Amino acid sequence: IDTYPGTLQVRNHIVRDIRNYGQIDLGGLLMKSSNVGATRIALQLTNDHLYDVFHRFGFGEVSGCGFPGESPGVLPAARGWGTLEKATLSYGYGLSSTPLQLAQAYAALANGGRLRAPTFVAGTQTPDAAVLDPQIAATVLEMLEKVISEGTGKKAAVPNYRVAGKTGTSRKAVPGGYQSRYISVFAGMVPVSHPRLAAAVVINDPRGK
């Protein structure tokens, strides 16, 4: 994936990386959180294909946990997407999700590509469905492990455990756009060899380094 020179103009908007990463593969895209790389991939997909990826992993609908008042988040209809909407969706803008939805999606990767409805009752079996080929899920899991060992998620490493996950930062949404305040997110699973836990952590207005 060519991310040179670290920026990409989409209509009247400039997509930026923190620096020029040049040629990277999918693993490198995840390790470096390349917005340019994610945009280039998204623009090669149809609206329906990209929407299907989000929807299969549970975004835009309630998780199935049965918790009263659960938010489905926001996933706009694909028919309204232009190139700019596809670009921003590829790196996490233009939609919203709950921490539970994020954890559920990462649990699906850890579960061999099967999305299972979460439950608050230990030992309860809930419905699940195949959303991704098991081999592809395993490959993505390996990439996410490198995010922890070599990329932006090094602080999530746990001694003697193989951790996989992804960091993220987004500006807070306000009516008509975004403000200059941020939300930081980490989602992941452990241990990679035999995943038992998946979690999503959200930090509102992070401070410090």
Language-model features: locations:
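Beta-lactam-recognizing serine transpeptidase/beta-lactamase-like catalytic domain environment
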Residues: 1-207
